[in-house]
Amino acid sequence: PTFHERSAELTAADISRIDIASATRELIRTSFTSTASTEEIESAKELILQAVEILQSSNGGPGSAASESHFSDRSPFYGAMNPLSMPMSMERDDSIGEFGAVVGIATFTEPYEGPPGHVHGGFIAAAFDEVLGMAQSLTGRPGMTGRLTVTYRAPTPLYQPIRYCGWVDRVEGRKIFTKGTAHNGETLCAEVEGLFLSMPAELMDLLRKGRDLSTPPGEALTGVIEKGRES
């Protein structure tokens, strides 16, 4: 499986993490829009702090559970275990381009608002990065973002399904050039061109196996990154 593909079935613990992420996602949205009284907000805060204490009481270490999960679980855009994700739905469309395309559907809510009633441009760009990142991995030589150029064509509304589409335009050595669009119905909201740099397989393996949120990358990992830049 690629970096973006799950290689194992969901466990009971995985499903519980998906459920708590969904509940937390709703909490984020509701706390952002609620008109509850000060007393009610204080009561809710105490319950939240109790939940945090329960989760921390048996914590295996900073970031330990996240380190064990797959990127498809913890992605900030389509990861079902990540409360910050929309989450986007992702599908492959083999009818587009040499390697196929990735289509993502996202519905942005108030926490993602920029202009009144519309999505902040930074989130639009970040969602493009996620879709193009998955699209470039279809080459079998996945890399990391080198450049992302977004052109905004029309305001992107909240609470509407936004259709992202990303595909590989061409490959030149270790450079993977990508393109993409974002539509609200028939309206083109934004388009993008991205450059990804294919990285050595050993670097991707180290990133997967050696990831530890509690400590910075070690010298061995830094050396592999430098090797990737030189190749």
Language model feature labels by segment:
Residues 1-60, 156-158, 169-231:
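HotDog/MaoC-like acyl-thioester-processing domains
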Residues 41-113:
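Long amphipathic N-terminal alpha/beta scaffold segment
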Residues 103-127, 134-137:
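A conserved, well-ordered hydrophobic junction motif at loop->secondary-structure transitions
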Residues 1-8, 130-163:
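Hydrophobic beta-strand-centered segment that forms part of the acyl-chain substrate-binding groove
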Residues 99-103, 147, 161-163, 177, ...:
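Intrinsic-disorder/low-complexity, polar/charged segments enriched in Ser/Thr/Lys/Arg/Asp/Glu/Gln
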Residues 89, 149-151, 163-167, 181, ...:
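Residues located in well-ordered beta-strands
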